[in-house]
Curated annotation (Swiss-Prot):
Role: Centrosomal protein which may be required for microtubule attachment to centrosomes. May act by forming ring-like structures around microtubules. Mediates nuclear translocation and mitogenic activity of the internalized growth factor FGF2.
Protein's gene: CEP57
Organism: Bos taurus (Bovine)
Stretches with biased composition (Polar residues): 1-35
Quaternary structure (record): Homodimer and homooligomer. Interacts with FGF2 and RAP80. Does not interact with FGF1 or FGF2 isoform 24 kDa. Interacts with microtubules.
Name this polypeptide is given: Centrosomal protein of 57 kDa
Length: 499
């Protein structure tokens, strides 16, 4: 009976020891043949007995990755601690079981059949405990692997965070560098705009000056035309008055008085009787004057440029180089008549030689201007080839086209002047031929009229030797009209004279 009571007490203690770790693990383990029991239906969740501590805060919004990782790690650590406590309790229970088995061996040795049965039961319980221990160790290994994996994940996340921060810093630096570059470009653009504004203002001032100079040149050209027209009118009026006066004198005065006056007066020259000398004006032979290509005619500090300016004034018959009488545009005949109180006498009209000289001077100036234009054409072509930008190239091409148009106009002027020179030469040759024919006729008539008296012969010879008093003036007037017509044709509005 005592043995039976001892066995019952030992069995109850053994069942209590086995029940404690099973309760801590959250499952009911009974002393039966199967080690596991069905999960109780009154606990639908695994952690229904879990109570949250008030110190631990709860978050209504989803946690971030780092916080979720830390919370998972804490849960794993809690589980590991609980498993370790369970393992310790299991070891303690194993120790107690080993002690009890030693105590029970004495009793079991006495009872062999009961001992065999107890041995079988103990072996079964030991196998169950070893299996539980192996399962706990496997769980611990898995948890350790999970911890290592989580540590690696945390390291990888930190490395990614540092790389992202470095990329942000590099992007910020690049953005600052781009901002500085853009600022420099904007400053350069501001400087270029200021320079462009300066150039536009300078160009506007230069255009205004050019317009003023062109207006002055037009005024001077108009004044020169008016003076030429006035001079032509005065010359024609004086010539008509002289012819009327000579006709009246020849009709009123008898022949005897005229013969006596001729005998008493000394012999005078043909041109000195009725004409005054031409106004003293500085005439320049343009063929002897040099032309320096590429030099400006405006006044400058350079000696060569000043010489070029003086040559330009001399070629254009500037009033600066003339005396006061010429500048005041008063004819010499009027000054002489005012001083002496004599009757009005006109100046001689320009001869064919003076017209030829003026035409040669005009032709020389036109050729010089054409040479200057050709030199400018070469310079513009070089600049177009060396131009760095397209806008500058287009502007230079426009200037080149305008220069080509002016060169064509200048070439037309040169051809017109040359044609007029050729016409004058033809007229001169025709006049010489007519004069030769007239002299031959006079010689034939003198041979036939040898019976005439000496006085009548001398008068006839003089009359035949010199032309009629109206013919020479008519020829000179015709030459003057031709010269004025060619000047008007050359100074038309369709053409521009470049000085």
């Amino acid at each position: 009976m005592a043995a039976a009571s001892v066995s019952e007490t030992s069995a109850s203690q053994f069942s209590n020891i086995l029940a404690e770790p099973s309760k801590s693990n959250g499952s009911m383990v009974r002393h039966s043949s199967s080690p596991y029991v069905v999960y109780p239906p009154d606990k639908p969740f695994l952690n229904s007995d879990l109570r949250r501590s008030p110190n631990k805060p709860t978050f209504a919004y989803p946690e971030s990755n780092s916080r979720a990782i830390f919370s998972a790690l804490k849960n794993l650590q809690d589980k590991i601690r609980r498993l370790e406590l369970e393992r310790i309790q299991a070891e303690e229970s194993v120790k107690t079981l080993s002690k009890e088995t030693i105590e029970y061996k004495k009793v079991l040795d006495e009872q062999i059949p009961e001992r065999e049965n107890s041995k079988n039961e103990e072996s079964k319980h030991n196998q169950e405990l070893t299996s539980q221990l192996l399962a706990a160790e496997n769980k611990c290994n898995l948890l350790e692997k999970q911890l290592e994996y989580m540590r690696n994940m945390i390291k990888h996340a930190e490395m990614e965070r540092t790389s992202v921060l470095e990329k942000q810093v590099s992007l910020e630096r690049e953005r600052q560098h781009d901002q500085t570059h853009v600022q420099n470009q904007l400053e350069k653009l501001d400087l270029l705009e200021q320079e462009y504004n300066k150039l536009t203002t300078m160009q506007a001032l230069a255009e205004k000056k050019m317009q003023e100079l062109e207006a002055k040149l037009r005024q001077e050209e108009q004044e020169r035309k008016r003076m030429q027209a006035k001079a032509a009118q005065l010359q024609t009026g004086l010539e008509v008055n002289r012819l009327i006066y000579e006709d009246k004198a020849t009709s009123c005065v008898p022949n005897t008085k005229r013969i006596k006056k001729k005998k008493s007066k000394p012999p005078e020259k043909k041109g000195s009787r009725n004409y005054f000398a031409v106004q003293p004006h500085y005439r320049l032979c343009l063929g002897d004057m040099p032309f320096v290509a590429g030099k400006s005619t405006s006044p400058s500090h350079a000696v060569v440029a000043n010489v070029q300016h003086v040559l330009h004034l001399m070629k254009q018959h500037s009033k600066v180089l003339c005396n006061d009488r010429v500048v005041s545009s008063i004819p010499l005949a009027k000054q002489v008549s005012s001083r002496t109180g004599k009757s009005k006498k006109s100046a001689t009209p320009p001869s064919s030689s003076s017209v030829n000289e003026e035409l040669s001077e005009v032709l020389q100036t036109l050729q010089d201007e054409f040479g200057q234009m050709s030199f400018d054409h070469q310079q513009l072509a070089k600049l177009i080839q060396e131009s760095p930008t397209v806008e500058l190239k287009d502007n230079l091409e426009c200037e080149l086209e305008a220069l080509v148009g002016r060169m064509e106009a200048k070439a037309n002027q040169i051809t017109k002047v040359r044609k007029y020179q050729a016409q004058l030469e033809k007229q001169k040759l025709e006049k010489q031929k007519k004069e030769l024919k007239a002299t031959r006729k006079t010689l034939d008539e003198e041979g036939n009229s040898s019976s005439r008296s000496t006085t009548t012969g001398t008068t006839n010879k003089k009359d035949f030797a010199k032309p009629r008093p109206g013919e020479k003036s008519r020829k000179n007037l015709q030459l003057l009209k031709d010269m004025q017509s060619i000047q008007n044709s050359l100074q038309s509005n369709s053409l521009c004279w470049d000085y």
